[in-house]
A protein has these predicted regions:
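Membrane-inserting effector segments that mediate pore formation, membrane fusion
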Residues: 270-307
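Conserved GTPase G-domain substructure that encodes guanine base recognition and part of the catalytic core
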Residues: 1-86, 91-281
Length: 307
């Protein structure tokens, strides 16, 4: 996924298309509207679950390591701004009862915050679980008692639960390092963990939230392991984002193809991500413009950016 500005490329494609000046004007106005949209994504989980590595892998950045600003009104939740993609990184839970209470209050406050239009500020919550841990009590408490009661409408479409560190879920056993994927024994174990998490949440809240498992990977001076199922995670993030906001991701998705190479292949997640982004283009820019089937002409530079 190439590092071009998708909104600039859309504008170029429109200006070069054989449309009336009136339609061009409407289309360009719609692009400005799309560009002005904001996504607010809250990322939370237990200490050591891999929130920072997940943020860095998804969005081709290392801001989560260095931190770029703290909002003192939200109990040390860090705010990372990638243009109009705004990531709220909550401190990890599980470091003591008093700290957990403090951090939970910060999360509740953020979930109840409204934007300038009086709508919930947070579009989606990504809860990251530590796949190598047997004790997920802190995570269940966070999901069932903090997030779900405070997230408001459509919780099943606004909460994503992702089990990280799939590669070490069985202490490193049954992970095929050469092919960077789980062998059958580990795959069965992970699928059971997904089913168990789903069942526990359903029993406590009545909601049906489908977790996934993945590995954010790592890189240091001596070694590197590519992510696994990161494309599945991004696919779900994009899928559950309102259509009019999805394009905001396009400028910030990691351009490193190795990040997206390995998955369970249940779907072609990379293809589905592109389809979701194109859907956002089609729906967002054509409002009020008479272009009909001509919309395909717009996907010159824009198609390169997404693809």
């Amino acid at each position: 996924m190439k590092k071009n500005d998708i909104f600039e490329n859309l504008a170029d494609d429109i200006n070069n298309a054989n449309f009336s000046e009136e339609n061009k004007s409407r289309l360009l106005k719609n692009i400005r509207k799309l560009k002005s949209e904001k996504i607010n994504l809250l990322i939370t989980g237990a200490t050591g679950s891999g929130k920072s590595s997940t943020i860095n892998a998804l969005f081709d950045t290392e801001i989560a390591k260095v931190g770029v600003g703290v909002d003192p009104e939200t109990m040390d939740i860090k705010k990372f701004e990638l243009d109009n993609l705004i990531l709220w990184d909550s401190p990890g839970l599980g470091d003591g009862r008093d700290k957990d209470i403090q951090h939970s209050k910060g999360i509740i406050s953020k979930l109840n915050e409204l934007d300038e239009n009086g709508k919930p500020l947070i579009d989606m919550v990504l809860v990251i679980l530590d796949g190598s841990s047997r004790d997920l009590g802190t995570s269940y408490e966070l999901i069932n008692s903090v997030i779900i009661p405070n997230i408001g409408e459509n919780p099943e479409k606004r909460i994503l639960i992702a089990i990280n560190q799939a590669d070490v879920a069985m202490k490193g056993k049954y992970w095929n390092e050469k092919e960077n994927k789980p062998e059958k024994e580990l795959e069965d174990f992970l699928n059971e963990k997904v089913a168990s998490v789903k069942r526990r949440i359903n029993e406590a809240t009545g909601l049906n939230i489908e977790p996934i498992y993945y590995s954010a990977g790592y890189k240091d001076k001596y070694d590197k392991q590519n992510p696994y199922n990161l494309s599945k995670l991004l696919y779900l993030i994009v899928k559950y984002t309102p259509v009019n906001k999805r394009l905001i991701y396009a400028n910030h998705i990691s351009s490193d193809e190795e990040m997206w190479k390995y998955s369970d292949e249940i779907k072609d997640y990379n293809r589905e991500i592109k389809k979701s982004l194109f859907e956002s283009v089609k729906e967002g820019i054509s409002e009020g413009a008479e272009i009909g089937g001509e919309i395909g002409k717009l996907f010159g530079k824009t198609g390169e950016t997404i693809g």
